[in-house]
């Protein structure tokens, strides 16, 4: 009784303190319906009108691809080729309650959530819809850790970075209302020593805080597709159900140059689109799609490509190498009384681990990849899923082709979870802290028996080790309960495949701008960084083109070059 009373007091204090701190926030978006104004320039890939030449072709209309396209369209013609369909075809994508449903929906080859199982035996998913993973994720929004920028090997314009974040945030990011379970878990984090209390912030900060969300307070999802509305509709075309099969290259004395792409529509008909003049092909197909497409196009390890009878365009030993996935370990508690469903809005952040939680209604069908395998026991009542994420990580694996000719056949992916013992150590630290979280007064009312410490909960799945000092037992727990956090990244790293301008080294007019480019997760959730990256790189490219054209004018070549079709913003077919 005393502990329950103390929990209530802590809860009231927590809400009061956070309320005082939430008022000091930057300008965010206002609650509204999902804005599909961009549909006026969306085409099905079967439309022959799409074939022609553009200043930029972007492969992938996902988290980074949409803001990149919108930005480039300010001055140039842009074609976005998205392999998935429109989100309007799947209404559950657009509501917070649909997060679990979308994982439950059977993969028919077209659904927005594409299923795969890594060679580690862990279930996982990819986005296959306009908006990419920003259309299927849990909606968490946070800016990158400031230390992340220093580790990338890139000289960032931090003023531009911050302006770019704001460009994203005033359209699709919201300050979430305090949900009951999220407030409770936040109180537990503070009580367990994940300090300080940072109130509301979209910055990556050590401690406990309420973070931004791409779900508004009516439960409507806002994703990267809405950033297309900021583009110039006269310069922008988006093709859906367009599976890019290969990059087209030309070769001459100036080297190998990307000049276009081959893509197929939903009927299997082949099409081509080209870039003109100083234009580029930009891959934004993600950590699995971008290395896969490079390999299929003959850019990768020479001996590997030769063994598959793929003509080598450029020898690149690190394409498909160094892919990482942040391990997710967790505890599920089944409380004695029903709790409301909630998405992640409260985070507990330390240098060794990141923690969060969702609460959910019962499952009648396994949500694919929510648990490590489909054989995992299902909750028959409301439950809380309390999660630990290992930052980094340091363990890494590979993307290799499952088909040497068909992009629709997903590649083989192996992440080698916990092969690096530092990752395992961070998991042990995080799960021990989760034990402290379970032992707080804040979670006492969620026990089914009045027992001390971590005992007394109705646990679904593997319980924490009883002995909080037994590192070996925790290591076993980490290995046996690991699931994907869905935050996999790498495969086309800056410094190995790309230069600091995200150009594929040794090839002209080809860049990669997406989650395949860095070896570590930028924050507790990567979505905010990659939304920013698309816009940021769009501005960088515009600035490069502007400087180049100014130089050409100064050399007296304006009439011959600047007035040629490549530099106009109209479409040419």
Swiss-Prot record:
Glycosylation sites: 30, 75, 145, 150, 162, 218, 252, 267, 309, 380, 402, 420, 467
Residues binding FAD, per UniProt: 63-64, 82-83, 129, 133, 137-140, 244, 486-487, 515, 526-527
Bridged cysteine pairs (disulfide): 427-478
Molecular-function annotations in GO: flavin adenine dinucleotide binding; mandelonitrile lyase activity; oxidoreductase activity, acting on CH-OH group of donors
Residues of the signal peptide: 1-27
Positions annotated to bind substrate: 356, 485
Any single Gene Ontology cellular-component annotation: aleurone grain
Cross-referenced SUPFAM superfamilies: FAD-linked reductases, C-terminal domain, FAD/NAD(P)-binding domain
Protein location: Vacuole, Aleurone grain
Domain of life: Eukaryota
Gene3D superfamilies tied to this protein: 3.30.410.40, FAD/NAD(P)-binding domain
PANTHER family for the chain: GLUCOSE-METHANOL-CHOLINE OXIDOREDUCTASE N-TERMINAL DOMAIN-CONTAINING PROTEIN, OSJNBA0019K04.7 PROTEIN
Family that this chain belongs to: Belongs to the GMC oxidoreductase family.
Function, as annotated: Involved in cyanogenesis, the release of HCN from injured tissues. Catalyzes the stereospecific addition of HCN to a variety of aldehydes in vitro. It is a major seed constituent, and could have the additional role of a storage form for reduced nitrogen.
Stated name of the protein: (R)-mandelonitrile lyase 3
Gene name of the record: MDL3
